[in-house]
Amino acid sequence: MATAALRQIWIPRFLPVPWFLCGSRRYASSSFKAADLQLEMTQEPHKKPDPSQPLLFGKTFTDHMLMVEWNQEKGWGQPRIQPFQNLTLHPACSALHYSLQLFEGMKAFKGGDQRVRLFRPWLNMERMLRSALRLCLPSFDKIELLECIRRLVEVDQDWVPGSMGTSLYVRPVLIGNEPSLGVGHPTRALLFVILSPVGAYFPGDALKPVSLLADPSFIRAWVGGVGNYKLGGNYGPTVLVQQEAQKKGCEQVLWLYGPDHELTEVGTMNIFVFWTYEDGVLELVTPPLDGIILPGIVRQSLLDLARTWGEFRVVERKITMKEFLRALKDGRVREVFGSGTACQVCPVHQILYQGKHFHIPTMENGPQLILRFHKELKAIQYGSKAHEWMLPV
């Protein structure tokens, strides 16, 4: 598929870059071109995973990767698809010392027709560009990068598992590669993309609900920070809190914010509450994109689907623990769930908050909405339902 043709299809789907990231210094006009893509096929292909064995997330990688280098003097170099290999970095590399790094997560699915399709990848490209500009990393043409990624997936498409629930995880990364201990705008950068076949998050379609630790002493993101960008520095500090949750018998963390203990995210997922609101109206609510919430691709997809159905109110609004617990006590909460690329939709059945366990009746209610979202997403992602969200490889 020619890049020019793809550009006409995708341009209307991209969101505008925030005005404060559009200065001339940050928003360079140069970019690499998919037409210049170089291809070096591996001479030592890896053994593909046994389809009968479970695939652990992020442990297996395909034969090839995409690499593009950038420096301030010459701009972007030629993109190349090359054999999967280790990186060589200077010990003073700015990504290692000052977290000048960002990443994306997206998936390719193989349908019953054996065709491989990417799920809403232009949204990932938009989010990746916003993250790059926030870190003063080089700009790039979203459509050119997307075409390079499509070509990479095409080269390694035999690695895409074919059973329901499995997929090929696509991990684009952009890092500052400045060989200096000074903190500043990097003059070198490296963009690379690796691929990993992954198994079903819920084997056999059996949804497993999770319990959450809600501790307001831990904060994931704050107003004026970078919680709405997909940066590596947002994830490392959450590991300790995740361990604390596990020590208390919880699988995930419910991140709270502010004096009112606003619900923000679940682990690395966006959070949704399906309930009857105080005015008696059935609604699906998720926190708004106010600067501390990551604009998840699946989050947006669930909102889009629910609004298309038009069967209940769909809102983006702040949710406090006080109003949530009041609704729980009144029996107005139907389902609570997280959404993300890894799990798609993950049910929640319990919250540990201020020393008390609160049961959420998600599973007792079907969970009808979660199952409906799962069914609809699978139909779209695996090609049984034609949809503009999917990009054929």
UniProtKB/Swiss-Prot annotation:
It catalyses: L-leucine + 2-oxoglutarate = 4-methyl-2-oxopentanoate + L-glutamate; L-isoleucine + 2-oxoglutarate = (S)-3-methyl-2-oxopentanoate + L-glutamate; L-valine + 2-oxoglutarate = 3-methyl-2-oxobutanoate + L-glutamate. Signal peptide: none annotated. InterPro entries: Aminotrans_IV, Aminotrans_IV_CS, Aminotransferase-like, B_amino_transII, BCAT-like_C, BCAT-like_N, BCAT_family. The keyword Amino-acid biosynthesis applies. The modification N6-(pyridoxal phosphate)lysine is found at residue 230. The modification N6-acetyllysine is found at residue 322. It holds the Pfam family Aminotran_4. Gene3D superfamilies: 3.30.470.10, D-amino Acid Aminotransferase, subunit A, domain 2 (3.20.10.10). One of its GO terms (molecular function) is branched-chain-amino-acid transaminase activity. Keywords: Acetylation, Amino-acid biosynthesis, Aminotransferase, Branched-chain amino acid biosynthesis, Lipid metabolism, Mitochondrion, Pyridoxal phosphate, Transferase, Transit peptide. It is an enzyme of class 2 (transferase). GO terms for biological process: L-leucine biosynthetic process; L-valine biosynthetic process; lipid metabolic process. CDD domains: BCAT_beta_family. It is found in: Mitochondrion. Its EC number is 2.6.1.42. GO terms for cellular component: mitochondrion. Substrate binds at residue 169. Residues 1-27 form a transit peptide. Its cofactor is pyridoxal 5'-phosphate. The keyword Lipid metabolism applies. Belongs to the class-IV pyridoxal-phosphate-dependent aminotransferase family. Catalyzes the first reaction in the catabolism of the essential branched chain amino acids leucine, isoleucine, and valine. May also function as a transporter of branched chain alpha-keto acids. Homodimer. This is Branched-chain-amino-acid aminotransferase, mitochondrial. The gene is BCAT2.
